[in-house]
Amino acid sequence: MHKVMKILLIILAVVAVVAITTMLVLRHPAFGRKMSKERKARIEASPNYRDGMFQNEEPTPQFSRSMPAMLWDFITNPPKDRTPKEPLPAVKTDPKNLPTDCDWLVWFGHSSYLFCLNGKRYLVDPLLKMEFPASVMMKPFKGTDIYTPDDMPDIDVLIITHEHWDHLDYATLRDLREKVHHVICPLGVAEYLEYWHYDPTIITEMDWYEATNGITCLPTRHFSNRLLGGRNQTLWASFLVEEGGRKVYIGGDGGYDSRFGRVREQFGEVDMAILENGQYNTDWRYIHSTPEGLEQAILDLNAKAVFTVHHDKFALAKHPWSEPDSIARSIAERNAVKLLDQPIGTIIFF
């Protein structure tokens, strides 16, 4: 009996430690907070919020196979070459001293990039500082983490496409706060930013098809979930930025659907389309861009130039790390597409 009681006490102690640790971890600001009643009311009034959550425009299963089938495939077909053996080439540009009298883009790996359009500087989904808890989930490839928030200039517009950890980073946004003049984000995402001490007066939350100051919020085919907030309680989006007669399409994350053709119909030819390419899996084809979906999206948009993102920094899927670059080049060659294919940090004029 004494031994049984001792074992039970040990088990209870372990459970208590785990529970307390979990509670403390979830109190980290990166996890966000409960949404305000006012924000929740606006979300529930959205035509895209139905049956207790945001919905995609087309039916969107999260996975194309059952979870047991995916787990079995992962066990029997383990991924190979997910990370590079050598540091990736990257260029250390000084974003603070880049000109604003011409249009350019500098990519920081994955889906983080800074671009200038008609004198305005736009920063998209910056992930420039690996701190807990993001550092537990993602490890940057060697050579790809050469930029920090300190390297950034003043930002005219910060654009966040959705709440996922690889797009909405607490540590980066905390350190950028004093440099940001205006924030554009989908419905619900501002709850994080306000919790992280961003001035609510500089934040514009948008629903699909709303527009402000030359920026139109548009659909993508994805989802949201950041643990505490619940599934699909904040919106995900793509954006069309128009400035000085030029147009940039920010595709965000999402599986292929008819939206790319509709962007072309509504806005005409865009000067640059920035599209997701990487961290894909056939099991996720409804919520992430596959190589086949990327090619069709490029054809539907028929943009003057294409730049692909969501690769070359983290291994978040099974495919070889170098595959997205090869696929993009093959698509461009096959379809006579102008592909802006440059290493991290390169100044790309467009």
Regions found by a protein language model. Name each.
Residues L128-D145, S224-G230, N281-I287, A315:
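Acidic/histidine-rich helix-loop elements
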Residues S112-C116, N213-E269, R285-G293:
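Catalytic core of the metallo-beta-lactamase
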Residues S46, M137-I184, G268-I274:
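Active-site metal-binding motif and surrounding structural segment of the metallo-beta-lactamase
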Residues F115, D125, H162, D169, ...:
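Divalent metal-coordination and catalytic microenvironments
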Residues P126-L128, E163, T220-H222, G252-G254, ...:
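Active-site metal-binding loops of divalent metal-dependent hydrolases
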Residues H2-F132, M137, I146-T148, P186-I250, I327-I347, ...:
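Metallo-beta-lactamase
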